[in-house]
């Protein structure tokens, strides 16, 4: 048959590529300059770009769409191969640079980042936080653990029956004076170490949290280094290890379970920076044992950075798709005009309100870890130095510093990881059916991400743990007239905004909503009044009755920290021409992520007027979205995430969403393979004989006639 114009319609297909380029050309500023703000400095920005390019060009570390088709076993093997490769980089660069490399790996291949992080982060941080200088030097340097060589550690805290309640762990470490050894034992199934990353196949050693028992007395949970495998990688006697199996995500991590059956370790394998046990069985406890839990805080700080890099990646995909995707012709377009374009998804106000809030937090986040380690608040590894002296003032200063970081890191970790999980799914939904395709990145990102909401502190439990000291501080101010220091010093304004001043409104008008510093003040007042309300309940009942309020306080504290830090950074940023755009983003964050979500709190405690909250939805948020809209592509470009890091067919830089998507689908699922591997089953179903044939016609009329004679 010859095709002619009479029987074939030829029309121009969609051209999303030109849409994104048009927006890029109309940008008001250079995304690279914005990236300097995002990363905190020109030097850091250039370093991150160089590290990303290095891994893109590395044939082993490079990741593409085939990543989404890997089985569990393939993920495990590939992860091990990548760790072997990454270890070579560790040999040649500083730990600070290597940590930045890991933060990038955590975006595009989080299971690789986690498996390395368990060794360098959790295992070594436990030794750094709980071991002596000599112990740290031995395990980290002499045994080359810090170079990902010789020893590969895992972190043995959680058990099958205990997670959040660390003090309730039941693995035992009983001191044997005669042999000068500890006997590590799993007394029952509930004490089985569980979810231990790296235990199933990789780890040679484990930092085990176990109950110290000397002469029959239980001294609580301490930490011990326990060898799991020998130099041939065979299990040590008495050590039983198993694989937990498939998980919701991060199957490249060999999470395992461990049981110890009277495993003996030398006394000096106990980490003894704080608690010490002599050969005679004398136990020396530290002045304040809270310091021994500082090892976990570093991971929480880095998870904040992970959260916002993931937010940047997910919002980049959804926003680039929303620019190229068109659906429905607007009312101002002739529906019969064949050349009239449909409306870009990005131009629908609802779409803007759904997506715009998620690319704002990444603008303030990369500096958070370094900010939490400023000279005024030294790294957690330095807090224990005052213990070498006997000055009570210095000891309590260390405790105050750690408590302050606990509040900040805990509130930020829980709030940021929750926001990350929410953002991934909202961005997926905003991409319609195509968001459901693995090749567009959302599915694996979500499955890999949500564990962040429960590990290293379950977010609800962590939220309550953060809210509790805030309420206690309010009680100490209210009942004892004490003064609070640190990041919650604003609680000292208690009398100014409670009692006879409890009706003092902070946000009265749209102008108030439009001033970030006024919003920050409103958050402080909301925290003060909510804390006082919770305190009144606690005095009558207990903290168990205010769990929801404590979590709310934790979230508000996180937003207070981020907005305060964001404004501080804008004020000190030397690219002043970008300040108006950054301030607009800050206003959008305050309006959507804070005020809109916590409107009930602000209204209940008279922090905001009804008029202000009404104007928030009808005036402020639509206005800010309209201001942000022209530069959406530039904002996503400012994250400087390459196509490899984004790893999404519909999220590539060129914006050619349909061609890229279709090409990847065909590459990974060749259309030349017209029959499925299970085609025999399908054909057997379709071509099966009739029921009469399968019954050999034994029930036919002819058979009946024969058998009835």
Swiss-Prot record:
Catalysed reaction equations from the record: a 2,3-saturated acyl-CoA + O2 = a (2E)-enoyl-CoA + H2O2
One Gene Ontology term, aspect cellular component: peroxisome
Q: Is Flavoprotein one of the keywords?
A: yes
Q: Name one GO molecular function term.
A: FAD binding
Q: Which cofactor names does the annotation list?
A: FAD
Q: Does the keyword Disulfide bond apply?
A: no
The record's Gene Ontology biological-process terms are:
fatty acid beta-oxidation using acyl-CoA oxidase; lipid homeostasis
For bias type Polar residues, the affected ranges are: 1-12
Q: What is the disulfide pattern of this chain?
A: none
The EC class name is oxidoreductase
- Supply the alphabetized keyword list: FAD, Fatty acid metabolism, Flavoprotein, Lipid metabolism, Oxidoreductase, Peroxisome
The subcellular localization recorded is:
Peroxisome
Which EC number(s) are documented for this chain? 1.3.3.6
InterPro entries xref list? ACOX_C_alpha1 (IPR055060), Acyl-CoA_ox_N (IPR029320), Acyl-CoA_Oxase/DH_mid-dom (IPR006091), Acyl-CoA_Oxase/DH_mid-dom_sf (IPR046373), Acyl-CoA_oxidase (IPR012258), Acyl-CoA_oxidase_C (IPR002655), AcylCo_DH-like_C (IPR036250), AcylCoA_DH/ox_N_sf (IPR037069)
Cite the annotated pathway. Answer: Lipid metabolism; peroxisomal fatty acid beta-oxidation
Q: Which PANTHER family would you find in this protein's record?
A: ACYL-COENZYME A OXIDASE-LIKE PROTEIN, ELECTRON TRANSPORT OXIDOREDUCTASE
Give the multimer and partner information.
Homooctamer.
Q: What is the designated name of this protein?
A: Acyl-coenzyme A oxidase 4
Which organism is the protein's source?
Answer: Candida tropicalis
Task: Tell me the name of the encoding gene.
Answer: POX4
